[in-house]
Swiss-Prot record:
Keywords linked to the UniProt accession: Cytoplasm, Cytoplasmic vesicle, Hydrolase, Metal-binding, Metalloprotease, Nucleus, Protease, Signalosome, Synapse, Zinc
Protein family: Belongs to the peptidase M67A family. CSN5 subfamily.
GO biological process terms held by the UniProt record: negative regulation of apoptotic process; positive regulation of DNA-binding transcription factor activity; proteolysis
Official protein name in the record: COP9 signalosome complex subunit 5
Gene that this sequence comes from: cops5
Described function: Probable protease subunit of the COP9 signalosome complex (CSN), a complex involved in various cellular and developmental processes. The CSN complex is an essential regulator of the ubiquitin (Ubl) conjugation pathway by mediating the deneddylation of the cullin subunits of E3 ligase complexes, leading to modify the Ubl ligase activity. In the complex, it probably acts as the catalytic center that mediates the cleavage of nedd8 from cullins. It however has no metalloprotease activity by itself and requires the other subunits of the CSN complex.
Record organism: Xenopus tropicalis
SUPFAM superfamilies: JAB1/MPN domain
Amino acid sequence: MAMAGSSVAQKTWELSNNMQEVQSIDEIYKYDKKQQQEILAAKPWTKDHHYFKYCKVSALALLKMVMHARSGGNLEVMGLMLGKVDGETMIIMDSFALPVEGTETRVNAQAAAYEYMAAYIENAKQVGRLENAIGWYHSHPGYGCWLSGIDVSTQMLNQQFQEPFVAVVIDPTRTISAGKVNLGAFRTYPKGYKPPDEGPSEYQTIPLNKIEDFGVHCKQYYALEVTYFKSSLDRKLLELLWNKYWVNTLSSSSLLTNADYTTGQVFDLSEKLEQSEAQLGRGSFMLGLETHDRKSEDKLAKATRDSCKTTIEAIHGLMSQVIKDKLFNQINTA
């Protein structure tokens, strides 16, 4: 019974995150040093600022990053990723946490973190892990996957001296709330580069106190298409992990775990609605300002979408609790 429950929970997680199994382990795990050196020498990303379009993340690296991000609670955490490049795809094979000081708005890497980073990569090579550092990750607890002004500056610096390099952002709070990993992979454009108009990107809820930071820098980077993969070896490791942790799915509730997050969402939504109402009220006294009205209506539409998202997540959490109550607390003894 326990094994069956574990299997169902694992399958649900894999389907939610579109996890793909690699048939041949050697196909993606084999490290071709000569090929990687040729790519580094050619530097095709210098000719095309939008060269890298895809990012593949191994299931093991994904779990390590999400568990690390979750352990930080409301504080941001930071880590490094190891991997390689295959054409227009950046492949993340592994990840490790960095000993950094985190706050609710940023992570501060000190000298000890850089020493730890260098020692880890060197020791990894000594045990046969030949992949190089391919990027860094950090968490945005509760406010979505995007790059702030500090993140953009950090990534620009990394791309200047450590190419190829990718920035990954994880939101552990929304991951628990939605039941699906909330992760984004990004690369920045060089200073002074104006990207072509790519049309509207996928909508995501941004808290009111973060909107300005998001809007100012959103044209300085682009998102890569992220997919996840696992090998037969990963499958064995995942089974061991799920056998240990699957009970947490039944014993925990997103309504209780994310109570502070949900409350914060409601407060943020009320502020957005008040702001939209005030702007619409001012617009009614200002003649000939159709652009102003359109912007106000656009903000109101976004606030409506945010309210729908919060409501759906709350309903899903409530439905989950009702189902568990029916299963375990109302057993018919007749």
